[in-house]
Amino acid sequence: MQLEVILPLVAYLVVVFGISVYAMRKRSTGTFLNEYFLGSRSMGGIVLAMTLTATYISASSFIGGPGAAYKYGLGWVLLAMIQLPAVWLSLGILGKKFAILARRYNAVTLNDMLFARYQSRLLVWLASLSLLVAFVGAMTVQFIGGARLLETAAGIPYETGLLIFGISIALYTAFGGFRASVLNDTMQGLVMLIGTVVLLIGVVHAAGGLSNAVQTLQTIDPQLVTPQGADDILSPAFMTSFWVLVCFGVIGLPHTAVRCISYKDSKAVHRGIIIGTIVVAILMFGMHLAGALGRAVIPDLTVPDLVIPTLMVKVLPPFAAGIFLAAPMAAIMSTINAQLLQSSATIIKDLYLNIRPDQMQNETRLKRMSAVITLVLGALLLLAAWKPPEMIIWLNLLAFGGLEAVFLWPLVLGLYWERANAKGALSAMIVGGVLYAVLATLNIQYLGFHPIVPSLLLSLLAFLVGNRFGTSVPQATVLTTDK
């Protein structure tokens, strides 16, 4: 183990836990459900931008994405920039209207919004189960990414790193709640920005300059410097699919959408769009370019996902590597705590309180349950991540696609189409979810498109057809989402 690398990382984790303790003390000033799961809807513009960005940018962006850029070349860097409008789309399409309705319905979770809009318990149960299944896959990816970071950069065995990482994040999420999550996201977003810039400078310097790095890539494989990438992977169908999956479809991600109901005011959302888009641009471009150019520095990696932690050790002094190891670690931790919190909220608010509405005011029991459920989920994820695949980006995209196929149209059409009803939403969820699962499992790509494209198209069609057999739901006027 490398002590110079580990010490700064330990200091970073101490700061994370310190923020969680602060959030736990602050929590006593608000009602439990609103404070624990939404931070009492008090986010300003900078915090909103950072938490949305940090939640969106995960192990896939800091580990898997640069790993793919290492394998496929500069074309993948171009592909990654497709994600640039993600924050603008999320806050622009969901943002203001979502927040207004959430306050009207006193919604704490995404499923609260769906129930208030469609008045269907079956829809809420289906949405809850879909969310939990997909989040298990998505969070497993993050745990694998965190353990690989510690393994490569700090010399800690994979299993030991997995335990350190998993236990740390489960504890601070369980006891700090949403406020700890977003405050840590803000700090972690700044760490990511600084770490990305410093690492990219180090990689370019180690490669002998930008021009020399590109020439080296061309020598290794001329396709590494073409827009199509190695193996001509970046076809028009692939790029369209990728845009739908990681940009447009982000509107349907529950842990992203819930950020849109927890900000303070209109000024916060406008500032969040601008700052968030700038941060996404810097992080996406910087990390993927570092991954692509990293092949000129270390051309013989057998596991592409190890490129960023390996580069950190190679191009930075040990102590600096320890400091900036916190950057990808921050990306991973911020995504997991958002997804863990959303999973806990789903189990408690959407499932447990649905069965036991009499427990709504029992805050002592709810606090205890929230912490225990988060810790149990963390333990299950440790088991799931014990034997990792070679490249995590595909598993992450699989989980993202499943969430988008289920949630996208019920969310968007529920907000903007007054005649949308429960039968239409249920039809879209079932068709989208089942079709995506079948196509992804059997690896069927119609006309070269990723399964998310036909799944969303047929899900939309199913919504329109199913909607004809239902009746319009009057807008809820009661300020409650008790199911």
Swiss-Prot record:
* Gene Ontology MF terms: pantothenate transmembrane transporter activity; sodium ion transmembrane transporter activity; symporter activity
Which residue ranges does the entry give as Periplasmic-facing topology?
1-2, 64-73, 145-157, 211-232, 294-305, 390-391, 445
Entry-linked InterPro entries: Na/Glc_symporter_sf (IPR038377), Na/pantothenate_symporter (IPR011849), Na/solute_symporter (IPR001734), Na/solute_symporter_CS (IPR018212), Sodium:Solute_Symporter (IPR050277)
Q: Which residues form the signal peptide?
A: none
Report keywords, A-Z. Cell inner membrane, Cell membrane, Ion transport, Membrane, Sodium, Sodium transport, Symport, Transmembrane, Transmembrane helix, Transport
Q: Where are the transmembrane segments?
A: 3-23, 43-63, 74-94, 124-144, 158-178, 190-210, 233-253, 273-293, 306-326, 369-389, 392-412, 424-444, 446-466
GO terms for biological process? pantothenate transmembrane transport; sodium ion export across plasma membrane
Any one GO CC term of this protein is: plasma membrane
Where is it localised?
Cell inner membrane
- Family, per the entry? Belongs to the sodium:solute symporter (SSF) (TC 2.A.21) family.
Its recorded name reads: Sodium/pantothenate symporter
| The species this protein was found in | Escherichia coli (strain K12)
Top-down, what is the taxonomic lineage of the species of origin?
A: Bacteria, Pseudomonadati, Pseudomonadota, Gammaproteobacteria, Enterobacterales
